[in-house]
């Protein structure tokens, strides 16, 4: 987020796989709560996910500790005024201008759609007993 404007860097396959997982769960015969214990829908998409992950930092960029080809780095030009910048991982389904708000939205998501198959779709759910469905990082600073 730069100056309140949201910039996303999604993995090219992730939304499609999240949609596929949501469809498997919605059309499945298992009780929905079962997927919080044993997410068999995720297990079905894992092979495709692993295959596409082989292209990380080859055909698209991710921050994973390895070299990122320059052509996949998004450059956001700023002028010489103060700018507030927020960098966050995809563990926040709804990025807000404060960490507290982002955490509140995460809590709302966990309480209202722990499978992540509604408005926000993900390739994994909030596993039973977990406060999150993914790792989280959030930093806000001004330049």
Where are each of the predicted segments found?
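Surface-exposed beta-loop interaction hotspot
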Residues: 1-51
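C-terminal catalytic subdomain
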Residues: 38-143
